[in-house]
Amino acid sequence: RCCSSAASDVYKRQLNDSGLTIQEMVETAWASASTYRGSDMRGGANGARIRLAPQKDWEANKPSQLQKVLNVYEAIASESGASIADVIVLGGNVGIEKASGVEVPFTAGRGDASQEQTDVESFEYLEPRSDGFRNYHQTGIEINPEEMLLDKSQLLGLTAPEMTVLLGGMRSLGISHSDYGIISDNPNQLDNDFFTTLLDMRVAWQPNGTGNSYEAKDRVSGDKVRTASRTDLVFGSNSQLRALVEVYAASDSKDKFTNDFIKAWNKVMNNDLFLD
């Protein structure tokens, strides 16, 4: 198992050399761990059920990309004896370390479930209909995506600051199912660009006619500058969330942003890791 720091360093080097992108590794780890529900303690990264039916085929998980990533992870796990579940989480950590230059804590101890141990019908109820962190929202859902984000966050046990810093960090890494909210020039760098851009008063936001998305136009030229979802923009329109955005957008908050993101990320990754 991937349980010693020396072993995890070896796996991290393999992941670094795997050819997978930062986005692929981070998205896969999030897709695996974010199924956790604090209400009944189901879901989560433990078991690596993201590689099994029904999770491997969920639209939110980008099945074709997921299979590409899992092929790499399964080879590493098979060669080393580590669990795929641990490799998935470690892969996300590697992606964040590459993007931030800061070490991400890792706790091993996850196991792998089999398809025979997985009740497909039961696990279908864990499928995300909306995940604001990935800017994913199924069509036909009448509940606003920002309200679904709040529900997702409370199921993950996140506070408002943790929800804010996680979403902003994910956007800075170019993670958005719909491509809305991607405003960073360098998606391979974890930074606070999402927050600083959200406070830009040189643009005016208008609905673009597609339901839950908006476009920003330059107030002087009228040119379209960027796009975002309702989920993205609630962090500028809601007074409590905007106050948090202003903290993370400050020029002297970059270290705080990075450290807070890593702490919140680690919390989600370890939600279902019951070692005591």
Regions found by a protein language model. Name each.
Residues 1, 8-276:
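Long, well-ordered alpha/beta core segments of mature domains
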